[in-house]
């Protein structure tokens, strides 16, 4: 029974260690890989069977070939599905597909469990059925309706200053100036 109780690999590793006291739990994240060779040490320990459960961030999905993965669990996938970016569904599908590709590569078939409050979400349905083409057709239709790339071009301007108030005022002034020329095509500022 997976319930959202906190965030981060450290918290998840602690919970798993308590639930499965005999399991050797390892972490694969920035905090556990402080030295350059820690990356390889952790992966080698997992492949040698010195780590039973490896808790990691998105780094694990990125083209790393690890043998003997029988189960991948994605907690709180809703966060991944609802990033405020027009590409979030495409990116979520890609990341979840990469993770799915990590399991059951050489031995027996693996299992992927995804925690979600929206099991009927279009990204999860496409992942389950393998219908990437259908997902992208829907995405392209939505992008056209809402005026997102590739149907328009977006430009993001970051305004930075050591004094947050100065940055806020400057970004509002800039947005006002741009609106005079471009009208409602200007979104923001987001402060």
Residue ranges of model-derived segments:
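Short, intrinsically disordered low-complexity segments
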Residues: 188-191
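Inter-lobe coupling/hinge segments of SF2-like helicase ATPases
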Residues: 1-172, 176-180, 184-185
